[in-house]
Amino acid sequence: PGQGFAFGYGSINGMGTPRHELATPALSAGHNPAASAIPVARITDMLENPGGAYDYNGQHRTYPDTRMIFWAGGNPFHHHQDLNRLLRAWSRPDTIVVSEPWWTTLARHADIVFPATTTMERNDIAASSRDRFILAMHQVVKPQAQARNDFDIFADLAEACGFREKFTEQRDEFAWLRFLYDRARHQVQLAGHDMPDFDKFWAAGHVEFPQPAQGYTQFADFRADPVAKPLRTESKKIQLASARIEKFGYADCPGHPVWRAPQEWQLSPLAEKFPLHLLSYQPATRLHGQGDPGRVSLASKIHGREPLRMHPDDAAARGLADGQVVRAFNDRGACLAGLVVDSGLRPGVVAMATGAWLDPLEPGVPGSLCVHGNPNVLTRDVGTSALGQGPVAQSCLVEIEAWVGPLPPIRVHAPPPIAEAGA
């Protein structure tokens, strides 16, 4: 006990649930003829620098000149860093289309919104490679108002482009579910296991696979026979250094582990102006930004603002009290928050969950105060390195002060005003 290491302790919840490596129903993404993709954390860079050069994972690439954005699934106004910079870049494309069930900040910054159904309004199948169940997601209510399934939205778009039949393959929603389930069932049977037919599965509501006789241990096959079960590395072994990465010649990422001082931490010169290190973490009251207007998330807020935790010494030094509304700020932006005095934090560190919907005091104006408490108005938007180009949200310095004056209302949880055509 207490030895080794593992992965997947977070939201995926895969630890302690061993399963056989069996197929699950999944829809192929198909082939994208654009043959172009960027690291997701570099969205703002792409919009700011059409045709600009960047390095990624050993490749020298060029950002596309993006004139149109179609966003379905996800929300950059939740997960991206330095949201004020993103907002400025967001105005550069000619057209932005969003497929979305809710009036999120993303939907509010779109030219066209396709109202999409929620999981309650459509039939679907839930499955994961990390557990032993396949679930039938039965439709609970009919699509509300003008909401439509994403599949139907894209089928109509395909028809407008002249290839509806090629896209749908002459299947509707339920026919696709049956097809995907039957295909997975065939693969499972080839692996020596059994699954009920689709009708029995749909009526029962789930399929449960048997638990393996032995639990899963990371790298167990490799340890038992490194020759027959090599790892997918240059040496086919566990590596602490990579000759391949070394050859990339990246100044910010050599081929071996090194420690380098972050640009923003408490020993950097910027800490004289912004002495508190902000950590942003996954919320306990919602999934990322999903469910933020729900009662569980709302019950956790303080005067309607996202909680911010601070050590008692830091609060006392600033004359702040538990439950008070405060303003967190740096040179990138500012947001309001509800203060929680917490002795479990290290002095000099403050912590705030992600996921509060961005609610600018002046909508559409970069730099406007977020009255709700989205920490990504504060975080830095630079790549981790030329190798990975990931986010560096946890390297962020801020200052905290008391909010003085009337509290602005939270407006992002209510639908925006809708102008009728011809009005």
Tell me the role of every PLM-derived stretch:
Residues T117-M120, R132-Q144, R295:
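Short beta-alpha connecting loops at secondary-structure transitions
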Residues Q144, D150-F201, K273, G294-R309, ...:
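Long, contiguous, secondary-structure-rich segments that constitute the structural scaffold
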Residues D111:
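Catalytic, metal-anchored helix/loop core of enzyme active sites in primary metabolism
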Residues L135-M137, V227, E234, E272, ...:
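Short strand-coil-strand connectors
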Residues P1-R108, T118-I125, A203-G205, F209-R318:
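Extended redox/cofactor-interaction regions of prokaryotic respiratory oxidoreductases
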Residues P1-G2, T118, Q139, E159-K166:
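Generic secondary-structure signature for well-ordered alpha-helical cores
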Residues S128-R130:
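Short, compositionally biased low-complexity segments
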